[in-house]
Structure formats: structure tokens, C-alpha cells
Amino acid sequence: MDNPFDLSQISAYSDWRARKLEAYPAEITDLRVPVRRLDEPTPAERTALKARIDIFNMAMVEVDPAGIQTQALLSFTRALGLQRTDANLFADASAVSRIAASRRNPSAEGCVDAGSEPPGGATLGDFLPYTDKPLSWHTDGYYNAPDEQVGAWCLFCVRAARDGGENGLIDHEMAYLRLRDESPQHIAALAHPQALSIPAHVQEGRTLRAASVGPVFSVRQGYLHMRYSARARHVIWRDTPDTYAARAALDRLFSRPDVFTFKLVMKPGEGLVSNNVLHCRTGFADDEDPSKSRLLYRIRFLDRILAD
């Protein structure tokens, strides 16, 4: 069976590569799909979303900001075939995370840290997504166990920051393509089962998350999966020359124009849904009024969005 991600299958890779590059160059507007009702996308809207995700592994959604509610998000993602949620540390009972910069003394409704701090010493401000600081390139859930990897996620903007907060997005398949073209050894190193280790997260003697060891690139049910963080702290790379070379190539990749980085400052009513593509975020400045501060809703899934 043809597998373009098998380094020994040169012909299968060449065919896949040609098909992949047909869609590029592309702009963020090429990902855009207006959706009238988030809780009930029409067959045409669903088809348009899946078509973009099939090509780019992501789509941009435009909806009425008032429609961005927990149950609407769950209905929308179920319409795309996503069922198994990833109940991460600060998600609510429906697996929805409210992403905002943590405030020590929240007073307004909608502040994500109001009553959401778990026991054991973990606080929202300890985690970069819940601050106004920049987020380096990563895929979601890179610290999850191998059998609990994040396959897809959605992210919707309820309120924008006063300034900043630009997202960068790169299709992980395009990253794979450029790295493999540079050297198949990069792929071999990053596909090693011990390529990237994330130490356990322990606070006050309580293990909040076990250690995670695994590859950067893997193939799951025939599809490419990427597990990556550009962070310098709390990550351990396999100590080999090939791994260091592959890491350096990845670092260079993020400034290359031919990897086709999509950039977006999300506005209220805009959303992203993706098969866990590479993404980053610049720092931002919030409004002093908590009721006007940046707020996004996110759900992670163990499933992947499949083409019809």
C-alpha cells in the first residue's frame, strides 16, 4: 500500500508532494468559510470547511460572535466528525477552555480564572496560553501520552485584544515536505520514538501530568501527525547529531517564505478549526476592563477531521 510518509517509498512521496504543492501559494482568505449558524452548519458549509481542511489541514470560520457558545461549539465540531474531546487541565466539564490572560483578582464574568484553578498548586498564570506573553511554535498537546495525542482543535474569538495577539499557522504536512526535501535524515531523526521527551509536571508533590516520550512525526491511521514545541525549557531532545541537525532545520523553517505561513489577528466571530497544525501567537495588550479583555474558546479532540 502506498505511503508517502515512508522514506523508502520515493514514488508515493513524489506524487503526494506534487498534489500538496498544487494548492500553494495561498492566502488566509483562501481558508475562509462563512457559517450562518455555528450550532447547525449547512451541508454546503460543512463541505466547504472539509474541502479546505483536506487541502490545508485547517479552515477559518466566520460566524456571529453571539453564537459562540459551548453547546454550539460542540454541535459544530460534531458536524465535522469530532467526538472524542481532550479534557485538558483547565477545560470545563464540556472540555471547553476559555483562553484569556490570567488575572489575580478576577471580578468580571467571563474571566477564565474565576473558580477554575485546580488544587495542587497549578495556576493559569503558570501556563503561557493563559498569559499575554508570546507563544512559540508548537502543536497542541505535545505533552500528552502517545495514545492521547491531539488530532484536531477549534479556536473561536469572543473578544479581541486591544493590540497584538497575531496567530501564525503552518500546515504540518508542508513543514514535513520542506524538511524531507532538505534531507530525509531530518525526517528519520524526528520520527525516532524517543525524539522528543517532555518531563512530568509535578507541583507540591502532586503529578499533574506524567512524562511524555515520543516522535515528532508519526503516521496515525495513514495520516501524518506532528508533536512539537519550540520551547527551550521543559523539553528534552534526543542527544544525537541527526536530531540536533533536524531541530536546527525546523528552527530555520519558521522564517522560510516557501513554507507559506498564514497570519491572522482574530476578530470577534472568527474561528479556526484544524488537524492540529503548527501555530504560534505574538504577545498582546489587553483592555484594563476585564469584560473587554481578549477571550477565546478552545476545544481539543483526539479525533482528526477526515475528508468525506
Language model features by range: what are they?
Residues 2-47, 52, 97, 101-103, ...:
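Active-site environment of non-heme Fe oxygenases that use a 2-His-1-carboxylate facial triad
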Residues 29-31, 50-65, 73:
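N-terminal, charged low-complexity regulatory/assembly segments
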Residues 59, 66-82, 86-98:
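Long, mid-chain structured domain cores
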